[in-house]
């Protein structure tokens, strides 16, 4: 069993921030971050993989950010949390005991199951897994037309980046305008004109 003062489950933005802030606030305690992938994507940079960057490796959060702060990193999928005994077990049967636990496992995309065809081949929700994102990158090389569902910040960024590669992109938003949650109508009208 591995012992740590603070165990953080999740190695993306929330987990990294939690571990880093704990290091600053509590000094020399033992901190361990468990994540389920070897590499962690910069979440807000994911759309740029498909245009500006052309690869996932340029969108990886460096482990050095944590290791330089003497934060331990472990790769594994947590399958059990025993809050009474303050232990966590991974799929590989590694067990960690902790004094404090932070669960920062991130978000998942909303799948619009009300749209017929959402389960078909070549429909890709965006997950933060590097291998999965690489598979999408490879698939994009073989297509000419791309539909992006969702006209919020991420959808608009995806549409813009993919269009930079010469693909015909259709951006679909169920509201009256893209980016409507962040800007007023006059501004969203201007944005839509620019996107066309």
Predicted segments, located by residue:
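FAD-binding core/adjacent interface of flavoenzyme oxidoreductases
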Residues: 1-7, 32, 66-147
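Beta1-alpha1 glycine-rich phosphate/pyrophosphate-binding loop at the start
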Residues: 2-72, 161-186
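Conserved phosphate-binding and hydrolysis motifs of nucleotide-dependent enzymes
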Residues: 10-15, 106, 150-155
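Short beta->alpha junction loops/turns
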Residues: 11-12, 39, 94, 129, ...
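Flexible, glycine-rich phosphate/dinucleotide-binding loops
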Residues: 15, 40, 87, 110-111, ...
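Aromatic side chains
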Residues: 48, 96-98, 153
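Predominantly flavin-linked oxidoreductase catalytic cores and closely associated redox partners
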Residues: 123-196
């Amino acid at each position: 069993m591995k012992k740590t003062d603070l165990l953080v489950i999740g190695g993306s933005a929330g987990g990294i921030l939690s571990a880093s802030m704990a290091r600053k606030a509590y000094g020399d305690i033992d901190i361990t971050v468990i994540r389920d992938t070897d590499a962690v994507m910069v979440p807000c940079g994911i759309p740029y993989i498909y245009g500006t960057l052309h690869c996932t490796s340029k969108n990886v959060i460096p482990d050095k950010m944590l290791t330089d702060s003497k934060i331990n990193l472990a790769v594994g999928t947590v399958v059990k949390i025993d809050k009474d005994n303050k232990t966590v077990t991974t799929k590989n049967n590694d067990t960690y005991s902790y004094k404090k636990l932070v669960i920062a496992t991130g978000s998942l995309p909303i799948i619009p199951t009300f749209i017929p065809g959402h389960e078909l081949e070549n429909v890709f929700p965006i997950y933060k897994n590097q291998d999965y994102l690489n598979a999408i990158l490879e698939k994009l090389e073989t297509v000419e037309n791309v539909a992006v569902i969702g006209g919020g910040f991420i959808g608009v960024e995806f549409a813009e980046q993919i269009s930079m590669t010469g693909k015909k992109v259709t951006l679909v938003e169920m509201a009256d305008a893209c980016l409507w949650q962040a800007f007023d109508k006059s501004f969203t009208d201007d944005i839509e004109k620019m996107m066309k």
